[in-house]
UniProtKB/Swiss-Prot annotation:
Taxonomic classification: Bacteria, Pseudomonadati, Pseudomonadota, Alphaproteobacteria, Rhodobacterales
Highest taxon of the lineage: Bacteria
Protein name: Uncharacterized 27.7 kDa protein in nifB 3'region
S-S bridge residues: none
Stored InterPro entries: ARM-like, ARM-type_fold, LRR_variant, LRV_FeS
Pfam family for this entry, one: LRV
Length: 245
């Protein structure tokens, strides 16, 4: 059943089923105008075409419309995909990276498109992410911070993006958490304080000290019972009482 926008090809021209080399599929219901068509500009119709006709994916990897190449790459044989790593369209390159064995992703570590590098960061093994620690895009580095081996994380402690530093603080070996005592972002220090409360008991930000009051041991709590902020004193007193029970 037709759905979505008017069925036009990727150049904006009306589709002509009679001129399509796959018109024989109409009778079997494996394609249909406004529903399932590899020449439609609407991605969902192209996707449906290859879901119904996966055996046709390989021969359409060179289709002139990038979205058709992307959808064909979803179901094509992986042995046909390496050449797509050099495709002119980043969406096609990204799909190839996601489907090919991880070793192929190394070729696109320096790809000019951030979406491709994001795909690479997801595919490389944790030990292979070292070259991406200095990627210019913050979201790429965030994925690296989430997946890299912990031994690489000290190199990201001073990352310009606070979201990246927060992820590093969550995963890094606790011995390195003292590097975050002077981090300019309180929310980053809060993450570090959850793991080593004692380092942040005298932090300038009440949110960080409140985290210490919630996570700290007796030594930290005894110092916080005289904190100038009511909520921190109360939390520390309550937790001390609970620990004594």
């Amino acid at each position: 059943m037709p759905e979505g926008p008017e069925p036009l090809d990727w150049t904006g021209q009306a589709l002509e089923c009679g001129a399509c080399r796959f018109q024989d599929l109409l009778e079997s219901g494996h394609c249909g105008l406004g529903w399932s068509c590899l020449n439609d500009r609407y991605a969902k119709r192209i996707e449906r075409f290859f879901l119904l006709n996966p055996e046709l994916a390989d021969e359409n990897l060179g289709h002139p419309y990038f979205e058709t190449r992307v959808q064909a790459a979803r179901t094509a044989s992986v042995f046909r995909l390496p050449r797509l790593l050099a495709d002119e369209d980043p969406a096609v390159r990204g799909m190839a990276v996601l489907r090919l064995p991880a070793a192929h992703a190394e070729r696109l570590i320096r790809d000019p498109d951030r979406a491709v590098r994001i795909a690479v960061a997801h595919r490389l093994p944790p030990g292979g992410l070292l070259p991406m620690l200095q990627d210019k895009d913050g979201h790429v580095r965030l994925i690296v911070a989430r997946r890299a081996e912990t031994g690489m994380l000290p190199m990201l402690c001073a990352d310009p993006d606070p979201e990246v530093r927060a992820e590093v603080a969550r995963r890094i070996d606790p011995a390195f958490l003292d590097r975050f005592r002077t981090d300019p972002e309180p929310l980053v220090r809060r993450v570090a304080a959850r793991r080593r409360p004692g380092l942040f008991v005298a932090d300038d930000d009440l949110r960080v000290r409140h985290t210490v009051a919630e996570e700290g041991g007796r030594e930290e709590l005894r110092r916080l019972v005289s904190d100038p902020e009511d909520i921190i004193r109360e939390t520390a007193i309550q937790r001390l009482a609970h620990l004594k029970e």
